[in-house]
Amino acid sequence: MAMAFKMATTGMRVTDECTSSFMDMKWKKVHRYIVFKIEEKSRKVTVDKVGGAGESYHDLEDSLPVDDCRYAVFDFDFVTVDNCRKSKIFFIAWSPEASKIRAKILYATSKDGLRRVLEGIHYELQATDPTEMGFDIIQDRAK
């Protein structure tokens, strides 16, 4: 698989699967969320897990490891007070306290490069524990 984009800060490359999965989520609504991971040896950002259209935010939370960093995008559909259907895409930088310092640094320095490739993100959250990215926070930010 060809690497279409290179992250300037760390030399990490984003695989085509990352961008195509994101576009499928954004435009075709076939995914509810995508979890990305960095493969340090191959210096690539890859898709770790894809949540189907019927999965929930809680499924995304459950798919994040308690001791390692990840990136995730979540497509949040909601209805406004004016009864309009809306969709907002959240980017989540997950860096739990139990993860290794090296992983935290690697994910922190690679984040902006991935964000540039994933066009159409509305909001960003950075979380070190589940309370910093709870569903109530997603709902409040989307208003």
From Swiss-Prot:
Transmembrane segment boundaries: none
Keywords for the protein's UniProt record, in alphabetical order: Actin-binding, Cytoplasm, Cytoskeleton
Alphabetical GO biological process terms: actin filament bundle assembly; actin filament depolymerization
Family annotation (SUPFAM superfamilies): Actin depolymerizing proteins
Tissues expressing this chain: Expressed exclusively in root tip meristem.
Gene Ontology CC terms, in alphabetical order: actin cytoskeleton; cytosol
GO function terms (MF aspect): actin binding
Listed InterPro entries: ADF-H, ADF-H/Gelsolin-like_dom_sf, ADF/Cofilin
Cellular compartments annotated: Cytoplasm, Cytoskeleton
All residue ranges annotated as the ADF-H domain in the record: 11-143
Induction: By the root-knot nematode Meloidogyne incognita.
Coiled coil: none
UniProt family annotation: Belongs to the actin-binding proteins ADF family.
Name listed for the protein in its UniProt record: Actin-depolymerizing factor 5
Organism of derivation: Arabidopsis thaliana
Phylogenetic placement of the source organism: Eukaryota, Viridiplantae, Streptophyta, Embryophyta, Tracheophyta
Gene this protein is translated from: ADF5
